[in-house]
């Protein structure tokens, strides 16, 4: 099983977890209000809400000499479960548990030094991460009713990069193809931290994240991969 398949399998397992978490929320939301004497506390603009979200983004930050990347094909995707707690009509707090996959495609050009000077047909760094995030939400339409509305999120994310692969692909002189997925890399840091911002309305939002820590140990003096990612998010909940 190659690195991409392993990360996709982990993504699928987390999807099942998130799906059943969402179903548990749905059962509560589908109570017949005419028969229920206790007002619900769960909803987009009620006391609390749980829901699933998906995100997809691109590397947006500047690369460095010696570790140039291919923009457009260097991407990230993620899935998670979000818990939001309303403090006031304009302010909420929350946390998220998620799984992220990141893929940095390395440009093969003279001057490359990360992770070595060898030029290959294709080369990338694959990351599979479990994440936990905490955020502040500021709503811009306090009189919106039970509706998610327009919002700004500011938060921090801790990442445990438990799957990291250096992937190399080449074509041999006889035309056969060889691919190597190298793990147990001695130069990587497995714990990282990001800060992020989201601007959205209802189910859709745009986000940007900025990595605060180094992916590589300082002992190796490698140029860092880009720290900025940007993309969009889809939240799944009943309006």
Regions found by a protein language model. Give the residues of each.
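Surface-exposed strand-loop-strand hairpins of Gram-negative outer-membrane beta-barrel proteins
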Residues: 58-80, 216-218
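Extracellular/periplasm-exposed beta-strand and loop segments of Gram-negative cell-envelope proteins
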Residues: 64-72, 104-129, 161-173, 177-194
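Residues that define the transmembrane beta-barrel architecture of outer-membrane proteins
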Residues: 46-50, 71-77, 126-132, 148, ...
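Residues on the lipid-exposed face of transmembrane beta-strands in outer-membrane beta-barrel proteins
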Residues: 79-85, 99, 132-140, 154-158, ...
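Short loop/turn motifs that connect adjacent beta-strands in outer-membrane beta-barrel proteins
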Residues: 40-50, 86-93, 142-149, 239
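Sec-dependent signal peptide cleavage junction
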Residues: 20-51
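Predominantly the C-terminal beta-signal and adjacent terminal strand-loop region
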Residues: 183-239
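Bacterial Sec-dependent N-terminal signal peptides
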Residues: 1-30, 236
């Amino acid at each position: 099983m190659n690195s991409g398949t392993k990360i996709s399998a982990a993504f699928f397992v987390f999807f099942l977890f998130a799906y059943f978490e969402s179903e548990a929320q749905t059962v509560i939301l589908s109570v017949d209000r005419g028969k229920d004497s206790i007002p619900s506390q769960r909803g987009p603009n009620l006391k609390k809400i749980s829901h699933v979200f998906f995100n997809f983004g691109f590397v947006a930050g500047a690369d460095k000499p010696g570790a140039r990347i291919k923009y457009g094909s260097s991407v990230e995707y993620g899935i998670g479960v979000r818990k939001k707690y309303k403090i006031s009509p304009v302010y909420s707090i929350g946390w998220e548990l998620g799984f992220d996959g990141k893929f940095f495609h390395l440009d093969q050009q003279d001057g490359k030094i990360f992770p070595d000077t060898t030029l290959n047909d294709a080369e990338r760094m694959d990351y599979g991460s479990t994440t936990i995030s905490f955020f502040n939400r500021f709503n811009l339409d306090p009189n919106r009713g039970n509706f998610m509305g327009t919002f700004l999120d500011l938060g921090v994310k801790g990442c445990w990069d438990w799957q990291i692969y250096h992937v190399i692909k080449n074509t041999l002189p006889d035309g056969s193809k060889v691919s190597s997925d190298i793990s147990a890399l001695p130069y990587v840091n497995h714990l990282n931290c990001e800060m992020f911002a989201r601007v959205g309305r209802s189910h859709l939002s745009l986000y940007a994240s900025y990595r605060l820590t180094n992916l590589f140990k300082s002992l190796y003096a490698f140029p860092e991969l880009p720290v900025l990612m940007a993309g969009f998010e889809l939240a799944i909940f009943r309006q």
